[in-house]
Amino acid sequence: MPKAKISALGCYTPPRVLTNQDLEKLVDTNDQWIMERTGIRERHIAAPEMATSDMAIEAARCALLQRGIDACEIDAIILCTVTPDHLFPSTACLVQNAIGAKGAWGFDLIAACSGFLYGLTTGAHFVMAGTHKKVLVIGSDTMSRIIDYTDRATCVLFGDGAGAMLIEATDEADDGTGFIDFLGEIDGSGGEFLRMPAGGSRRPASHETVDQRMHYVHQEGSQVFKYASRKMYEVCRDLLERNHFKVEDVGLMIPHQANKRIIKAAGDRLGIAPERVMINIERYGNTTAGTLPLATRDAISEGRLKKGDLVLFAAVGAGYTVGASLWRWAF
């Protein structure tokens, strides 16, 4: 069976930066309040003319450039997002056309903040099945389009950004790098605690839904915090145990960047040293499907992630969706 490895990485964030001081002018909040509760200092915001596909295209091109391959070599595109350009056609189709990935197939994957992690796992299994040689997994979200900037509880949390990873087959059997295992679960009983109430078939767009601001993110923060910090710890613990690894074996844990307090709580319960937990939420906020590739890029640039390291990705998102995966880093 072929091995699946991550062979390239590309990211994109819009140039505009929205600071906590900027938010002080919009809602009743301040830098200290935001930093203490979230760990976020600033976030990037897409220009009005920029959509999710535009950021995804930039990230995809960066990944292809890093790998030095043509888009025609891509077999499949998995586009992870909760903010597609349209309900249909899929954003994956728009990206495929723009980058010239002729012959590729693909789809959009909606799993909120766990989306990119689920996409990585799906892509890895396509490769390991022997049916695909190269799968491009992209996480891209323009969360600013579904955020209520009169709600201080949510508007401080989110930013816009995108990242792409190329997964490909490798015959380097003795290299030891690549995908190891994944563990995930969903729990629909928590769906009401983090959601966008309208815009789907349950509550299609109407004057009423717009007037009631139902097309924005609604969150019950305390419920999400308790669940996320507990489940992130549990899924990481169980995945390590299943593969006979100790916490000390992990070179770097790269968690979804939702809230610094959630990450710290999960890491403390897991017993992993803080210096082996990647946190970059201060600069980007929660970019939903973009957080894992953005955090991975920064880890590499800071010299915290090197070839051969055991990497533990973890995420908890709306739904609820939960997951963790282990990889031996390949570059």
From Swiss-Prot:
Primary residence: cytoplasm
Superkingdom of this protein's organism: Bacteria
Function (record text): Catalyzes the condensation reaction of fatty acid synthesis by the addition to an acyl acceptor of two carbons from malonyl-ACP. Catalyzes the first condensation reaction which initiates fatty acid synthesis and may therefore play a role in governing the total rate of fatty acid production. Possesses both acetoacetyl-ACP synthase and acetyl transacylase activities. Its substrate specificity determines the biosynthesis of branched-chain and/or straight-chain of fatty acids.
Sequence segments annotated as region (ACP-binding): 257-261
This enzyme's EC code(s): 2.3.1.180
Native source species: Solibacter usitatus (strain Ellin6076)
Written domain comment of the UniProt record: The last Arg residue of the ACP-binding site is essential for the weak association between ACP/AcpP and FabH.
SUPFAM superfamilies documented for this protein: Thiolase-like (SSF53901)
Location in the cell: Cytoplasm
GO function terms (MF aspect): 3-oxoacyl-[acyl-carrier-protein] synthase activity; beta-ketoacyl-acyl-carrier-protein synthase III activity
Active-site residue list: 113, 256, 286
The protein, known as: Beta-ketoacyl-[acyl-carrier-protein] synthase III
Keyword Ligase belongs to the record: no
Subunit composition and interactions: Homodimer.
A GO CC term assigned to this protein in UniProt: cytoplasm
InterPro entries found in the cross-reference section: ACP_syn_III_C (IPR013747), ACP_syn_III_N (IPR013751), FabH (IPR004655), Thiolase-like (IPR016039)
Pathway the protein takes part in: Lipid metabolism; fatty acid biosynthesis
A Pfam family matched in the record: ACP_syn_III
CDD domains hit by this protein: KAS_III
Main EC class the enzyme belongs to: transferase
